[in-house]
Curated annotation (Swiss-Prot):
EC code: 4.1.1.23
Known partners and oligomeric status: Homodimer.
GO BP field: 'de novo' pyrimidine nucleobase biosynthetic process; 'de novo' UMP biosynthetic process
Recorded superkingdom: Bacteria
Keyword field contains Lyase: yes
CDD domains recorded: OMP_decarboxylase_like
Catalyzed chemical reaction(s): orotidine 5'-phosphate + H(+) = UMP + CO2
Organism from which the protein derives: Rhizobium etli (strain CIAT 652)
Keywords: Decarboxylase, Lyase, Pyrimidine biosynthesis
Active site: K63 (proton donor)
Protein name: Orotidine 5'-phosphate decarboxylase
Any Pfam family hit: OMPdecase
HAMAP family: OMPdecase_type1_B
């Protein structure tokens, strides 16, 4: 798996037109895209199908959570769309239902542990009596037990999460900020180099590429940083 298969560019733009322009600009440099609520509700599901049909990989970031049957029905339909990854909140019953529904489809299910925009104060306000680190590890273990394909977590937790998950499950890390970039609304961030060194398998980068004056140049800079982490020049 090379760097292009590990870098996921978040299409965090409000319209299909802007998404199409960005994909065209990035060209063959980018293979993998994340599509979330903003674009889905602007007609993004059909766009996601079209991208997948063109050979791109799609991470559908829907963070599903509902009763078992509803989750299973949704996952069955998404599995038919040719998506590569799908998120749901890492609640055990929902994860087990999703795993059963996606069996044999090739869809990689990812459990969302704790949003990278949340810190201990945010969790306490929401009624959780655990710090982000402890909750991430607990949900990672629950995802492994449910048979999920991987989890989404901050790169700051990736090393310990890898110990929980073992060598084969995916660790997808948002909140990635290239060296020298602004953190935005993310509270638990890491550079591409450090995230891969910590054990992440896939990195989600949106704003530093999408909002860059030259998105293709920004994407190549991230890819180069990833290559340096995986294949250091002096080795």
């Amino acid at each position: 798996m090379d760097a292009r298969e590990r870098l996921i560019v978040g299409l965090d733009v409000p319209t299909i037109g802007e998404a199409e322009k960005l994909v065209s600009t990035l060209g063959d440099d980018i293979l993998f895209y994340k599509i979330g609520y903003q674009l889905v509700f602007a007609g993004g599901l059909e766009f996601a199908r079209d991208l997948a049909a063109s050979g791109k990989k799609i991470f559908l970031d829907m963070k599903l959570l509902d009763i078992d049957n509803t989750v299973a029905s949704g996952v069955e339909n998404i599995a038919r769309m040719g998506m590569s990854m799908l998120t749901l909140h890492a609640y055990p019953k929902a994860m087990r239902a999703a795993v059963e529904a996606a069996a044999g489809s090739g869809l990689c299910l990812l459990g969302v542990t704790v949003l990278t925009s949340m810190d201990a104060e945010d969790l306490a306000e929401a009624g959780y009596n655990q710090d982000p680190h402890s909750l991430v590890l607990r949900r990672a273990e629950q995802a492994r037990a449910a048979g999920m394909g991987g989890i989404v977590c901050s790169a700051a937790e990736a090393a310990e999460v890898r110990e929980v998950l073992g060598p084969d499950m995916a660790i997808v890390t948002p909140g990635i900020r290239p060296t020298g970039s602004d953190h935005g609304d993310q509270k638990r961030v890491m550079t591409p180099f450090d995230a891969l060194k910590a054990g992440a398998t896939h990195l989600v980068v949106a704003r530093p590429i999408v909002k860059a004056p030259d998105p293709r140049h920004a994407a190549r800079a991230v890819l180069n940083e990833m290559v340096a982490a995986r294949w250091p020049a002096n080795r």
